[in-house]
């Protein structure tokens, strides 16, 4: 089958601290990951019309025709994961990091390639455990369609991407955590006025609206 190009929303996800979790309890971690996929992530992807492109030991790469569907899916999975982890000790929690990008991709068979995919993977690496980072184009596409707030993390220079990426963090209702730079370090806080401008205030979306 010949490769084809198309525009798609790409969601990349992985498990924060996967090696540590596996080292502490390999069988228990694998069993919980299998349960999370069967009970939560895979059904949510199907509900929002996504296609799981590939899985790794600790990661997922998912393609959506709609960026709105991609963001809704990510937010619903992360909120459900937070509920699932509520009574789990901190050192045993399985927490996901997610990145979403909208871009031109190449589909070859069932796999996908291209800069649009690579950017999603780099956004994922910038996300905090339990968090979601998106590119500016994703924020611009969904900000007037969904009621989520976004926190501007500024331009980030990331590995193997020649241009800086403007990164936004979806605010899931928790107190704002320190911003991270491309290496995962806490970034300097912006001035108060800049911080106010950086956050797009929206009322949270209800379950029925989603």
Name each region found by the language model.
Residues 15, 105, 158, 205-208:
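Hydrophobic pocket-lining residues within nucleotide cofactor-binding pockets
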Residues 170-191:
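Juxtacatalytic C-terminal regulatory tail of Ser/Thr protein kinases
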Residues 1-75, 79-80, 209-210:
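Catalytic NTP-binding/metal-coordinating core of nucleotidyl cyclase/transferase enzymes
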Residues 1-4, 90, 191-196:
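Short glycine/proline-enriched loop/turn "hinge" motifs that connect secondary-structure elements
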Residues 187-210:
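Acidic, proline/glycine-rich low-complexity intrinsically disordered segments
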Residues 3-5, 47-48, 126, 149-151, ...:
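Short hydrophobic "helix-edge" motifs at membrane interfaces and signal-peptide entry regions
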Residues 14, 41, 57, 100, ...:
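Residue-level signature of catalytic and energy-coupling elements of molecular machines
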Residues 61-171:
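Catalytic beta-strand-to-alpha-helix segment of the class III nucleotidyl cyclase homology domain
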């Amino acid at each position: 089958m010949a490769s084809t190009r198309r525009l798609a929303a790409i969601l990349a996800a992985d498990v924060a601290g996967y090696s540590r979790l596996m080292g502490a309890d390999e069988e228990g971690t694998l069993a919980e990951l299998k349960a999370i996929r069967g009970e939560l992530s895979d059904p949510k992807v199907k509900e929002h019309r996504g296609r799981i492109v590939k899985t790794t030991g600790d990661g997922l790469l998912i393609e959506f025709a709609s960026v709105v569907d991609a963001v809704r899916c990510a937010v619903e999975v992360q909120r459900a994961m937070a509920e699932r982890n509520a009574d789990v000790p901190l050192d045993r929690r399985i927490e996901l990091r997610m990145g979403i990008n909208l871009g031109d991709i190449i589909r070859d068979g069932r796999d996908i390639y291209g800069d649009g995919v690579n950017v999603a993977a780099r956004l994922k690496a910038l996300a905090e455990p339990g968090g979601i980072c998106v590119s500016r184009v994703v924020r611009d596409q969904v900000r007037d369609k969904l009621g989520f707030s976004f926190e501007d993390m500024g331009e980030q220079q990331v590995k193997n991407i020649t241009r800086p990426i403007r990164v936004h963090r979806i605010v899931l209702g928790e107190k704002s955590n320190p911003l991270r730079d491309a290496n995962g370090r806490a970034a300097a806080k912006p001035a108060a006025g800049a911080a106010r401008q950086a956050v797009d205030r929206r009322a949270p979306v209800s379950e029925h609206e989603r």
